[in-house]
Design a protein with these regions (language model features):
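N-terminal Sec-pathway targeting helices
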Residues: 1-13
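Domain-level detector of nuclease and nuclease-like folds
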Residues: 77-221
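Short, His- and charge-rich active-site/binding loops that engage polyanionic ligands
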Residues: 33-95
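Hydrophobic h-region of N-terminal signal peptides that target proteins for export
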Residues: 15-24
Length: 221
């Protein structure tokens, strides 16, 4: 084998090693954790969940006595070091925005408490968290009361800035599937200080969310 060929082979092997190392680091960045009412796929480098998944059901919303909202934001006990993020949020002006909403666990104390784990939080501008994001949460619960079961996925992408160990995402998304009607809805919100402009103005085709998030959405038959 000629010296020149050996050099090309060595270079090729080095490039492959770099590629595999990069892919390995990328794969290890996220971890999926299952809790009682939701599962979260958390990015350790970004400090926010890239995907959270759960069901909203009529049975889970209707009970004689609703549980008391916990309001204690704490690290996820299954990922304590990476989700010890309270100091990152303090004094920064961002809401600790729920992905899986506490109100979706109105009848389950454990699920309500688990909704306040930082593995379920995203740094959202108050205008989004208390505006269109909240409106969509309420609309989803209304749909569950009417149609019994709704499957929900949501997450965030990108980075505007860093606050401590937490990235403030550029956009937050949500996908909703109504089991009874087999209807899909997808929404994409810019994470900024603009006032709410209505859900219709943020509705997008499902494939847009699949492209930006890297996830495929389907229902297990």
């Amino acid at each position: 084998m000629r010296a020149k060929e050996k050099v090309f082979i060595i270079i090729g092997l080095i490039l492959l090693l770099i590629l595999f190392t990069f892919l390995g680091v990328k794969a290890q960045d996220t971890i999926t954790i299952k809790h009682k009412a939701y599962s979260t796929t958390f990015s350790k480098s970004k400090g926010y969940p890239v995907k959270v998944e759960w069901w909203v059901t009529k049975a889970g919303l209707t009970c004689p006595i609703k549980v008391k909202r916990n309001d204690k934001f704490i690290p996820d006990p299954k990922l304590i070091n990476e989700t010890d993020l309270q100091s990152s949020y303090t004094g920064q002006g961002f809401d600790r925005g729920h992905n899986f909403p506490a109100a979706d666990a109105a009848c389950d104390q454990v699920a309500n408490e688990e909704s306040f784990y930082f593995s379920n939080m995203t740094a959202q501008y108050p205008a989004l968290n208390r505006g269109d994001w909240k409106e969509l949460e309420m609309m989803t619960r209304e749909g569950a009361l009417k149609d019994d079961s709704i499957h929900v996925w949501c997450g965030s992408v990108g980075e505007i800035k860093k606050i401590g160990k937490v990235s403030v995402p550029k956009q937050c998304w949500k996908v909703i599937h109504t089991k009874k009607t087999n209807e899909w809805l997808a929404f994409l919100f810019d994470n900024n200080q603009d006032k709410a402009d209505g859900l219709k103005n943020n509705e997008v085709p499902l494939n847009v969310i699949e492209q930006i998030s890297g996830f495929k959405f389907y229902i297990n038959k």
